[in-house]
Curated annotation (Swiss-Prot):
Disulfide bridges in this chain: none
PROSITE patterns: HISTONE_H2A (PS00046)
Stretch list, region Disordered: 1-24
Protein name: Histone H2AX
Regions annotated as coiled coil: none
Phosphoserine: modified positions: 135
Domain topic, free-text comment: The [ST]-Q motif constitutes a recognition sequence for kinases from the PI3/PI4-kinase family.
Source organism: Picea abies
InterPro entries (UniProt xref): Histone-fold, Histone_H2A, Histone_H2A/H2B/H3, Histone_H2A_C, Histone_H2A_CS
Cited PANTHER family: HISTONE H2A (PTHR23430)
Tissue specificity statement from the Swiss-Prot or TrEMBL entry: Expressed preferentially in meristematic tissues.
Function, in words: Variant histone H2A which replaces conventional H2A in a subset of nucleosomes. Nucleosomes wrap and compact DNA into chromatin, limiting DNA accessibility to the cellular machineries which require DNA as a template. Histones thereby play a central role in transcription regulation, DNA repair, DNA replication and chromosomal stability. DNA accessibility is regulated via a complex set of post-translational modifications of histones, also called histone code, and nucleosome remodeling.
Extent of motif [ST]-Q motif: 135-136
Alphabetized GO MF terms: DNA binding; protein heterodimerization activity; structural constituent of chromatin
Amino acid sequence: MSSSGAKGGRGKAKSTKSVSRSQKAGLQFPVGRIARFLKAGKYAERVGAGAPVYLAAVLEYLAAEVLELAGNAARDNKKNRIVPRHIQLAVRNDEELSKLLGAVTIANGGVLPNIHQVLLPKKSGKDKGEIGSASQEF
């Protein structure tokens, strides 16, 4: 048996293209870069093989969630481009994201429109007979 380039079935064939860990995991975020940051950051003495993959997946999910909501906010405002205001509206109107990013300030995000209930005019029209909405039937 003469196999070209292989030694008894071991090793990779020479024409095999390298596949990144992000591609293996089906992610867009860079697993290798996150692994490098985890090692350089001295968060722990050693970093497991699955930790950067898991962290990349979590970060990708959070980014996709925020972008989805910000895109909806931009579309509601009839805009094609997501600006920091749309991200602010998306994060603050979502209960879980607002809790997660509660202490985060988004630059140029503005504030949520909110008028306190005490400052709103009282609806006293129903107590007294409403003149404008009276029925036309006799």
